[in-house]
């Protein structure tokens, strides 16, 4: 449906505590809408929204939605949700989160960042650059920016930067002026009936919905995007480590948790020297995508370089949380949201490069039974790269258990060599005690996953650090 601002004054948000819906609610509040919402329990997102004026109840009994002009929901809301059913009965217009976002973006020059991995950091880095360059953007990303402590902002400038979600194919609501895709991977295949080719074709459709005079920015290191690039009718800009990328990363090196590299591009006679306050080649790629877009909008180069150098990152993306005190020293605790084998691999590589002499203890909470089943072999391979694996039970994210796709099944798939350095912790609350027993001074402890593993971080550092 189209969003008519003359009649839409009150929006009700189902699952308002989720990062995506909470960011949308924040933008609506700052645009003057009355926002009500519901969720099962309070969290930092709901607390932030309540301070901004949102009216939130913590149940889904269907009583709070009846007076709204429209209701917004995410893919996390099931068809039998009482509020969703009440809205349908009351004939209240229902919009998916992505549909409402796309409606808001129509008022601006829009930039949509998609991809299986890296889209939150890239969109956050891009938003930070636009702010630093005084372009006063509106943005909505899939994580809390560490500098502003918010996933959203309403500015007075011409640009709207948003993360585009392929997990439920809702990015098809968007018709951006600039579209970015960081990579394409076999994830969220349940949305695409298990058909990777259908996923690929959906990405092509998304990119072809870019404005006729718009720009598509693709990472040429990704084999699927390399295949797609020549098929597109829009102007394409490529980036990557690949020698034939238009924006090419060269001379990459990592010093501690900082990255140094150069970008060769058709816009410059001399390479651009970039310092990034984040580790990992994957973040160098993210910064290169930002650089390509900055050139498209003719951003001031000194402002761009400053923004990349001082970008503080996104919460739960290689975030250093503190130290856990041990009897004879301390262990450093890092939290990372990555939950796909390729994301785990990138996190481990960045940590190894930052602390090559220190032991890596990876605490991994698998996310969704379906993903664990579909990528079991890939998980086994990447988890073998750590020095000690602490495996938690699968975080269901609302899915029913799948036989052969739980934590114990993953443990059984590990090799004999891996079994000697693997600990299975079925209950999250037992994790602090387990880590106290197995950790050594100077360990790097990485808490990895998109589920509720983050809830233990504060207790872990406060109790033991």
UniProtKB/Swiss-Prot annotation:
Its main location: cytoplasm. One of its GO terms (biological process) is cell wall organization. GO terms for molecular function: ATP binding; UDP-N-acetylmuramate-L-alanine ligase activity. SUPFAM superfamilies: MurCD N-terminal domain, MurD-like peptide ligases, catalytic domain, MurD-like peptide ligases, peptide-binding domain. Keywords: ATP-binding, Cell cycle, Cell division, Cell shape, Cell wall biogenesis/degradation, Cytoplasm, Ligase, Nucleotide-binding, Peptidoglycan synthesis. Its EC number is 6.3.2.8. ATP binds at residues 115-121. It catalyses: UDP-N-acetyl-alpha-D-muramate + L-alanine + ATP = UDP-N-acetyl-alpha-D-muramoyl-L-alanine + ADP + phosphate + H(+). It is found in: Cytoplasm. InterPro entries: Mur-like_cat_sf, Mur_ligase_C, Mur_ligase_C_dom_sf, Mur_ligase_cen, Mur_ligase_N, MurCDEF_pg_biosynth, UDP-N-AcMur_Ala_ligase_MurC. Cell wall formation. NCBIfam families: murC (TIGR01082). Belongs to the MurCDEF family. This is UDP-N-acetylmuramate--L-alanine ligase. It comes from Coxiella burnetii (strain CbuG_Q212) (Coxiella burnetii (strain Q212)). The lineage of its organism: Bacteria, Pseudomonadati, Pseudomonadota, Gammaproteobacteria, Legionellales. The gene is murC.
